[in-house]
Regions:
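Class I SAM-dependent methyltransferase Rossmann-like catalytic core
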Residues: 32-60, 64
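Conserved class I S-adenosyl-L-methionine
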Residues: 65-76
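A short glycine-rich, Lys/Arg-flanked "PGG" loop and its adjoining helix->strand segment in the class I
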Residues: 85-86, 163-176
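Conserved beta-strand signature within the Rossmann-like core of class I S-adenosyl-L-methionine
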Residues: 95, 177-185
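S-adenosyl-L-methionine
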Residues: 108-136
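A short acidic, Gly/Pro-enriched loop at the edge of an enzyme's catalytic core
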Residues: 138-148
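Conserved Class I S-adenosyl-L-methionine
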Residues: 193-219
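Core SAM-dependent methyltransferase catalytic element
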Residues: 231-271
């Protein structure tokens, strides 16, 4: 792992790493449109664009082509990796902080990610992979990242008591003024968080409070990933909806019509 961190430091040096991030610079969603249309994207990921709004989301987080970006748990699917790695490969740095081979349940997916990077060096040859697990979070050298992003992970960390060490790792990795971007399934306000954690939903007010307790400051919110059709009252929780369809063929068309979950999109800064 020390070798990986030294490699990241060397890359940051080549990028003229400075000590402070520029807070959420204005970026147009149109900036990312050519990347969304690129041949590097898998059809399955493209099909999810109407629900995930990648151009608007990345613009909201203020990601520039010279940013150092850490994505938490991209997995082998690499939805955002397919967009960000080509975007950052010349001037910036994309770091994939992934569950590693030390955890058997994640080994196969992690190996798929590594193989994918190896098979497509023109796109992913500069991607750096670091470790992210419950007891060990060396995701990037301290104070090196402009942006840390996480998509639909918060509910798992809350359920598995991993939230506090995860947020500490993000804070340590970010430069002063760096951005933490969080997207997750938005919970109901008429239920406590305890009543809905197991269903995969997180109350937005609870998420904000917990993240601010870790030293971050809420900078802005966005409704770009909102879905008012999501009633949040399903037998199999949020996984009832696409893309999981945990109920399989039961009422599949009903859930397809609802679409993917209602999600909050939050931008925090390291103070």
């Amino acid at each position: 792992m020390k070798t990986v961190i030294r490699t990241v430091c060397a890359l940051l040096g080549a990028l003229a790493f400075c000590g402070n991030a520029v807070l959420a610079q204005a970026v147009s969603p149109a900036t990312f449109e050519p990347l969304l249309a690129g041949a590097q994207r898998s059809p399955g990921n493209v099909a999810r664009d109407p629900y995930r709004h990648p151009a608007q989301t990345l613009a909201f987080f203020g990601i520039l082509d010279n940013s150092t970006v850490v994505e938490i748990l991209p997995g082998s699917g690499g939805y955002y990796m397919e967009i960000l790695a080509p975007w950052l490969k010349d001037k910036g740095l994309y770091i994939a902080a992934n569950r590693d081979g030390s955890q058997p349940q994640y080994l196969a997916d992690h190996q798929k990610l590594l193989q994918r990077l190896k098979d497509e060096p023109a796109l992913y040859g500069k991607v750096v992979v670091t470790e992210f697990r419950a007891d060990h979070h060396p995701i990037a050298p301290p104070g090196s990242a402009d942006v840390v992003i996480s998509f639909r992970n918060l509910h798992n960390w809350m359920d598995q008591n991993e939230l506090e060490p995860s947020l500490k790792a993000f804070y340590l990795a970010l430069k002063p003024g760096g951005v933490l971007g969080i997207v997750d399934h938005r919970g109901r306000t008429d239920q406590t968080q305890a009543e809905q954690t197991a269903s995969g939903y997180v109350r937005q007010d609870v998420a904000i409070a917990l993240i601010e307790q870790a030293g971050f400051k809420l900078d802005a919110t966005s409704e770009v990933n909102a879905n008012p059709k999501d009633t949040k009252d399903y037998a199999q929780g949020v996984w009832t909806l696409p893309p999981s369809y945990r109920m399989k063929e039961v009422d599949r068309e009903k859930y397809r019509a609802i679409g993917e979950s209602d999600r909050f999109t939050l931008r925090f800064v390291k103070q």
